[in-house]
Each structure stands twice: as C-alpha cells, then as structure tokens.
C-alpha cells in the first residue's frame, strides 16, 4: 500500500500546512511500517495545479514500471513493499534570477524541516525500522533538494542509522561544480548518500540559455559556467564522491544496465534518448522531457538494486 501527501511551502521556506509535523510523525510510527519514503520537488515555472499534474503523472508511471519490473525474472531485489511520498509545492513562476534564490530558501528551510521531522520521528522510536529515503528533484527542484541536504550536513543533523539515503537530480539547474567542496552544496557529499544525476545535449534551457543568464547575473566575474544538467558533474565533484559511474540512456533502456554500477555517484547521459524523440520544445528543448519509461527504469535500477 502507498500513501501520498503534499507539502505546500511558501517563498520564505515556511511550510503552510500546520499539521505536517503530526502527519509525518504518525507516518513514521506504528502501525505504519513504510519501507520507502519519497520526497520530490518540481522545478521552475510550475504552479500548484501543474505541480499536482506532474506529480500524479510521475508517480503513476513510475509505479507502473515498478509493477512490470516486479513481474520479470530476475527482478530487482529491493522493490518497495510499502511507500510514503511527499510532494513539495513551492511558488516557482517568477524570473530565472528570482527562482534560483527562492529554490535555495525553500530547500534550506522548508524541505530541511521536513527531513528533520522524519529523522526525529524515527529516532523517537524504540526500534526504528529500516527505511530508504529517496529524494528527487527536477530543474530548480534539484536546488531545493541539495540546499536541504546541505543544511542537514552543515548543522550536524544525525541521519538515523536505519535510514539509507538516495538522491536523483534530473536535469539540475545549477552550476556543474556546486557539489565541489567549495560549492554551494559542497557539504552534501559528506552525508552517507548515493547520487544519480542526469544530463543531456538536448537540454536547450541548460545548454544554451543557462550560461547566458548566469553571465548576466555575475557580469564581472569573468567565469564561464555550465549547468550540471548540461555538462554533468565536474571532475572535482567526481573525485569527492570517490569516482563516478557513467551510463548512456537510449531507446529501450532497462534497469539491468544500471544495477552493476556500485559507485556513490552515477552520471547518466539522456542525450541518446532525447535525440531519438525529436527536436523538443523551441526554447527549452528536452529540459522537461523526463516522462519516459527508460528514465523510470533508470531510477528504479538506481533506487532498488
């Protein structure tokens, strides 16, 4: 059985549902015994209605792939027996310049608080169950996720020993070196987590427009930047994670291809898949082209191997 809630967070990172703490405490306590918890953040230019539609589509299509995988042989050994999902809703329909900062605020305060509530509820139990916590972000939602992890790491919050932490960043809209030790999210790698990042040559938003916008914001820095979702993780980031596994995702990709990769950091190239699906949108290309069976198979193989 699966359960799903939404967590509305305003532009100041304040959770607008006053009951969210008690809901999460109940969810982490008996008689519930969830094996997997998902926290997902949407990206830029998504209103509340659009966010719900995105979450509904993503969760249903991922669930469909998990059921199909469960019926295959050999199957993935750690498919979720019972899951609980939290969908983060935050106001993201402003300019590029405003949204980057807002995403960090939402993560640093709102999603950080959600994670603290989950950890504290588990730690209060006499015998906390084993739990896999899966964080997913798309576009600026990756900033939401990473700023929350950065804050968890910096303030010394103890992730309960029974919690296994996995993170997926789909077409992340931040600089490719922000996970370096001196980057905005440089402390996140110190947590005991596994990380899957995707990139694509077909992502026009990140490959073409993101560097221009960053240069305008930092006019006098003289620094050339690339987005993580366009260039992939920097060499320094890969070293910080102890190396990176690399995989290309094309038409017909299935989960067995990612299962053998044991590195903490996996870099997945979606370029072959996007190239096979046409030119994409005029402005954004394939930036939001994440609703494919092959991508769900990639995520499943990473999370549940």
Task: Go through each PLM region and give its residues.
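Gly/Ala-rich beta-loop-alpha elbow adjacent to hydrolase catalytic centers
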Residues: 136-141, 145
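Short, surface-exposed "cap/lid" segments of acyl-processing enzymes
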Residues: 29-94
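Short hydrophobic segments within beta-strands
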Residues: 40-41, 136, 198
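Surface-exposed alpha-helical segments enriched in charged/polar residues
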Residues: 25, 29, 60-63, 116, ...
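Lipolytic serine-hydrolase domain surface
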Residues: 1-18, 44-45, 53-56, 78-80, ...
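Long, contiguous juxta-domain segments that are non-catalytic but functionally important
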Residues: 1-32, 49, 67, 71-75
